Structures are given as structure tokens and as C-alpha cells.
Amino acid sequence: MFIGIDVGGTFTDAVLLDRGCVRASAKVQTKEDLLSSLLEALDKAMKGVSGDLVERVVLSTTMITNLIVEKKYDPVGLILIPGPGLSHQHYQFNTGTYIIPGAMDYRGREIIPLRRQEMENAIMDLADDGYKNVAVVGKFSSRNNRHEKEVAARLRWNYPDCQVEMGHQVAGQLNFPRRVVSTMLTCATREKYEYFVDSVITALSKRGIDAPVFILKADGGTLPLPCSTRVPIETIFSGPAASTLGVQALTPPGETSVVVDIGGTTTDLALILSGSPLLASKGAAIDDYLTHVRALAVKSVPVGGDSIVERVGKEIIIYSERLGPPYCQGGPMPTPTDALRVLGLTRLGDEDRAREAMDSLGAPLGMSPGEAANKVCNLVIDTISAEIQLMFTQWEQEPAYRVWEVLEKRKERPSTVVGVGGGAAGFISQIAATLGAYPVIPPYAPVANAIGAAVALPTLEVTLRVDTEQGYYSIEEEGFQEALDDANFTEQQALDLASKWLGKRADKYGLNQRIEDVEIIRREVFNMVRNWVTTGKIYDIHVQTPRGILGHIGAGGEIK
């Protein structure tokens, strides 16, 4: 049996798959006490099933996405060590940023020592400005992290309560600005993510579940839950990835469609082309900043069923913030869910309270509760439709999209919009009509994210670095390094070695799958030249087991 759990800002969903069928599902409200929500969802989904029958648990969450979209995280200060090159004006990240002298070259050799006094000044200034979270990032720190470690050690010595993140621990790829953003967001979200992981582990333990536990990454692959605390930002689009895989599993093989997952806090958009989710070639983008996170081409729009709706003068405005449940369920403010209740498009909550909420918006403008509800719903529909149109201009620039157009021998946008999530039934028909497309709401749409998590193939990664001149290789995920005495070590040998380590990690985490096809995420080769002679090579290889789903779920709940 497999369990899929999706922890959203509004609801926590769980599904139990038994021999390829959806045996049970549950949807409960996400409470402040996350542990109680997880236990309630597990109890409803398992319905007396013994925990020792569970073979695997996969989670997804919009927790990190919602934190960032709503900007509900503590500010993060930056200490950057960029070395020579770009003007410092290029390093603007809308937060307190201190640049100190020091530099490593691309081989990891120190070319400019740290200036201790300027380091001390930056640390003191950040503390004086009230920063309790600090990201320390140096260019080429993935090749030599000594400068980052020195600054971080001094920070922790002076201010033991300060949360410090270092760039080399977050991302091994080169590209300094992306590593800065990735490290900054990791620092901003770590505390709440660790609370999430602790709650999950406690809930599973209380229900006697001792199976391997994974969490969905932004690219639709998985990560062992204990390992995910090292890089919480990898789960930044975990929720959107889950809804995409859920739609992939709930629609016929080979379908092309736009995915619209309308939750309580956000609406997630994605694209499936001929049965395969579209991958973002440049990585996850947050507030127009690119990160090192490999992700599906998704976007989280800050509008959902629980978004605050307010009258400002003669206008009704939807804010990108959630203050709690809808007014009809005891919440403090009117929301789109209240509008749906008034229009008879949902049965959630108390109808009288929903009418009261819409009347508070509409009466000063001379509108009836029904007219105000229509106005609110149209605002939601227009916002989401406009974001889909905007996303199409980005999707159409993706290399994979262009290849799909060539293979399909046609240049037109997908004509099917698949709605999932709690708000899909109320909005998706009008959104599809606005786009001139056909609306589809598949079976199990309200718990599609949990299904997407449950059917996700477990994946593992290996990041291999080989330096034939210095005579060593290392496996980043295992913290392993070993001597290598083959000066003629080839790229193919490096790929074979990475695949071998994938097999070792699969055994370690109890994955009963053969490592045959390997997905190459990154392969880079650098020649070392001295006195016009090649003296060695550096290989950076990043591979993972293939992403995908176990199969497609039919209307009867069985996997086909």
C-alpha cells in the first residue's frame, strides 16, 4: 500500500492506494497544529489499516510556496563574496546586502584573501539592522568553501542565535546570482520547513508507519524526507508538481492540457504536453529571480478560495493573502469561497454567513449579495485567465515546447483546461470559456495533489565531481570522497560511476527498482591546461533515476 499526503495552506489531503486502486481518500482542514491535521488525515484515509502494511509514503506541500508568495518569512541579510568581475550594482536583492573582499578562482584556489576587518564590520552592521537570518555566499564556493565557512563561523560565534546558511551547501552548480537567491530563500524557509518535517515524522510514528518517506521536488522527482532538510528550497514547487502529476495520472495517456489547481491560498498553473509535464529549462523563478532549483514550468498565482476580499472606495479588491478560513466557515473576512456559496457553486460553510459577507461588500455599492458574489468570482476568473495567457508566452519559449510543436506538426495552444483542487468546480468552466478551451474536472479532483504524490515514482540523485589532475572524486549527497589514480578517466566512466552510486543509494533507501535508464540533469567537462598541454579534466555530473508516475487512475480508482 502507498500513501500520498498533500499539506496545503487550507486543507491537508491524504489518499491510500492499495494494489493499484484508490482505496480511500481524506480532506481535512490544515490547522495551526500541523500534527493534529496529519493524524486526522491519516486516520480517515487508513480507516483501520495497520501501519505495517504501508510500503511507501510520499508527501507534497505548498508550505514553502505559500510562505514565499505571501512573503510571510523573516528578512534575510546577505554577506556576499563575489570577487572581481561584475559591478556590485548587479547584486541587488531587495534586502540588506554587504559585499566583502575575497575571492576563489574557478579551480577553488584563493586569489584574494578575506579582509577580516571588513568581514567584522559587515557582521556588526547586519546585527545592528536586526537581521536574525543571514545567507553567506561566495563565488566559486562550490569549488572551495573556506571563505564561506570562515564568515559563517564568525557569525555564529558573535551571534549564536543567528540562522546562517552557506551557498555551497545549497547549490553546487556555478552561477553566482542564482546561488545567492537559492541560499537566501533556503535561509528564509528552513525553520518552518523543519517544523513540517518533524510533524510528519511524529505523525507517521504515532500511527505505526515505518515505511520509506519521500517528498516531491519541484521537478516531479522525489527526495528522501530526512535528506530534504538540507535543501528545503528543492520543495518550493512541491505542491504544483503534485497537482501536475495528479492530473497526469487522472487523464488518459498522451493528453495535452493546461493544469489549473485552485487551492485556498494559491492557484498553481502547469502544462502537460502529450502526457509529459513541461520542464522549465532555466530552473524555478521566484519574483523574477532565477534559482538553481530544477522545476516543472509552473507558476503559483497568489489568489485562491480563501484570499481576502475587501471593498476599497467603489472598488472590490482581492488581496494576495489569506487570514484564515472563509467567512462562511467562521473566518474574519469575505473570500471567493463565500461568493461561490452565495451562487450555489459550493456547499461549504453557512449560506447565511456567506450572504452576510457578500452584503458587506455589495451594499455600499448598491449591489445585492448575488451581484457582489458575481463580481468577486469574475475578478478571480479574470486574474487566473490573465496569468494563464501570460504563462503561455513563457511556455512557448521553452525548448521542449518548441520540440513538441515540431513533433505535433502544428502551432496552436492546448485546448483543454483541467481543473483540480477545492475551487475547481466553481471556477474552471468560466476560466476555460475565457480562454476558448474545454473544461475538464477529472475524478478525485479535490484530492488530485495527494494522488499525484502517491503515484510519483521515487527518485534519487547523485552529484559526482571528478578531478583527474588532483586525483579524486566525490559524491556530494553522501559526503564521500575517494582517491582516483586514473589520469585518463573518461566522461563515460564518470557517467558509469554516477550510475553505480545511484544503485548504492537505491539500496540504502530501500527502493526496489532497477537502475537502468538514468536521467542526466547536468554534465560538464572542463579541460585543465598548463603550458599549452592538457594536464587533466574536471567532470561535474548530476544524475537521477527517471521521473514519472506508476500509472493512470481510471474513473473506478484503479491504476491502469
Question: What function would you assign to each model-found segment?
Answer:
Residues M1-K560:
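N-terminally biased helix-coil "hinge/interface" segments that flank
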